Swiss-Prot record:
Organism of derivation: Rhizobium etli (strain ATCC 51251 / DSM 11541 / JCM 21823 / NBRC 15573 / CFN 42)
GO molecular function terms listed in the Swiss-Prot or TrEMBL record: ATP binding; ATP hydrolysis activity; proton-transporting ATP synthase activity, rotational mechanism
PROSITE patterns xref list: ATPASE_ALPHA_BETA
The protein's name: ATP synthase subunit beta
Enzyme Commission identifier(s): 7.1.2.2
Protein's gene: atpD
Entry annotated with the keyword Hydrolase: no
Length: 475
């Protein structure tokens, strides 16, 4: 703390859990400035939230405030919280204030960046509607992701959210040469640890951030104070913005965006603000908007964000998920009933939506094929009760054909993943958009009515399905 001579120095006057009040003799630090103090040998960062008058500021602690005492010295850093950014962050885990927490040594980067930034000006943003090809058939065909867009990922426990996220990280690195940033916001520490090790096992990252790592991890888990959970998404976003400004197409994952709102609500209550609807903070829409508006495509690069969304009590009208929905361009819904059939990725082709599925954006052919696929699957869904009660024999010939095609489509929507290769033994497949459209076009037009259902399960392109059918016939 030798720099104390040149910076404003204050004293702790009150500690109430995560809220710490600090009094300054001279100039008061600006709102959102980071203050630092030494808490039993550990650096504790406090973020200024309010000016109380009487030369006092109210701050939110980014770590546990246990051990702080009144009268303790606090130094104003003169700037917001700044975190390391750059290629050195790949394969590493850091916390909300940019400190490495993976026991793999210090994180030395050439650049640091403040976590509070303005959204890019409108003139810097790219207005062209483009889709981000993921190489995953069901996503690219039925609910394509917008480059620089926001995607909501819905799904219960154990339906394959993590595997889908890892495959997206892998495919974006392969197809676009882009990096990914994963922000773990208020989720289980065990899951964060599992994800880190699974990424190393599946080759997405190298141990200790070695050469070839494709993703940076930023964690503020459930056990952290609300200040850390409310800011960790911004830390992850700051790392992603640096890659975008280097000309990259970046994938930014947030798991879970609801916890960002929840932490904001806790902080708001601690600061004494009057709560709004359902007890949420009155600044809910502003907090969400400030973060989401930073996720966009600029003339240099793009940040495409995939956000897992927890829906409290399955109530879609709850203010937290409802505020998130306003920002989404696409939704990917994972379904347990599809996972139970053994079809992975278990993306629900009828519930998942995208505003990019528009003939003006994806083209007439893609749009027509996608709509035909959905109508065939919808018809099958409508007939399922009849089949369950009366059996297939009672259906008309036309309906029997529709059911047979729908079952083939269902299986063709599955595909082997690169990141699951180590568990399944099947080599992963990255399918080009043209091959996806061509394959499904043939299916809905009846060109492959002669092939068995099994030929379409867990293959990449239609050529592989035809090969598989030949092998099945020969067996």
């Amino acid at each position: 703390m030798a720099e104390a001579a040149t910076r404003s120095v204050g004293k702790v006057t009150q500690v109430i859990g995560a809220v710490v009040d600090v009094a300054f003799e001279g100039e008061l630090p600006a709102i959102l400035n980071a203050l630092e103090t030494d808490n039993n040998g550990n650096r504790l960062v406090l973020e200024v939230a309010q000016h109380l008058g009487e030369n006092e500021v109210r701050t939110i602690a980014m770590d546990s405030s246990e051990g702080l005492v009144r009268g303790q010295q606090v130094i104003d850093t003169g700037a917001p919280i700044s975190v390391p950014v750059g290629d050195e962050t790949l394969g590493r885990i850091m916390n909300v204030i940019g400190e490495p927490v993976d026991e793999a040594g210090p994180l030395n980067t050439a650049h640091k960046r403040a976590i509070h930034q303005d959204a890019p000006a409108y003139v810097e943003q790219s207005t062209e509607a483009q889709i981000l090809v993921t190489g995953i058939k069901v996503v690219d065909l039925l609910a394509p992701y917008a480059k620089g867009g926001k995607i909501g990922l819905f799904g219960g426990a154990g339906v394959g959210k993590t595997v889908l996220i890892m495959e997206l990280i892998n495919n974006v690195a392969k197809a676009h040469g882009g990096y990914s940033v994963f922000a773990g916001v208020g989720e289980r520490t065990r899951e964060g640890n599992d994800l880190y090790h699974e990424m190393i096992e599946s080759g997405v990252n190298k141990h200790g951030g070695g050469e070839g790592s494709k993703a940076a991890l930023v964690y503020g888990q459930m056990n952290e104070p609300p200040g850390a959970r409310a800011r960790v998404a911004l830390t992850g976003l700051t790392v992603a913005e640096h890659f975008r400004d280097q000309g990259q197409d970046v994938l930014f994952f947030v798991d879970n965006i609801f916890r960002f709102t929840q932490a904001g609500s806790e902080v708001s209550a601690l600061l004494g603000r009057i709560p709004s609807a359902v007890g949420y903070q009155p600044t809910l829409a502003t907090d969400m908007g400030q973060m989401q508006e930073r996720i966009t495509t600029t003339t240099t690069g793009s940040i495409t964000s995939v956000q897992a969304i927890y829906v409290p009590a399955d109530d879609l009208t709850d203010p937290a998920p409802a505020t998130s929905f306003a920002h989404l361009d696409a939704t990917t819904v994972l379904s347990r009933s599809i996972a139970e059939k053994g079809i992975y990725p278990a993306v629900d082709p009828l519930d998942s939506t995208s505003r990019m599925l528009d003939p003006m954006v994806v083209g007439e052919e893609h749009y027509e094929v996608a709509r035909k696929v959905q109508s065939t699957l919808q018809r099958y869904k409508a007939l399922q009760d009849i089949i369950a009660i009366l059996g297939m024999d009672e259906l008309s010939e036309e309906d029997k054909l529709a059911v047979a095609r729908a079952r083939k489509i269902e299986r063709f929507l599955s595909q082997p993943f690169f990141v699951a290769e180590v568990f399944t033994g099947s080599p992963g497949k990255l399918v080009a958009l043209e091959d996806t459209i061509k394959g499904f076009k043939g299916l809905v037009n009846g060109e492959y009515d002669n092939l068995p259902e099994a030929a379409f399960y867990m293959v990449g392109s239609m050529d592989e399905a035809i090969e598989k059918a030949k092998k099945l016939a020969a067996a």
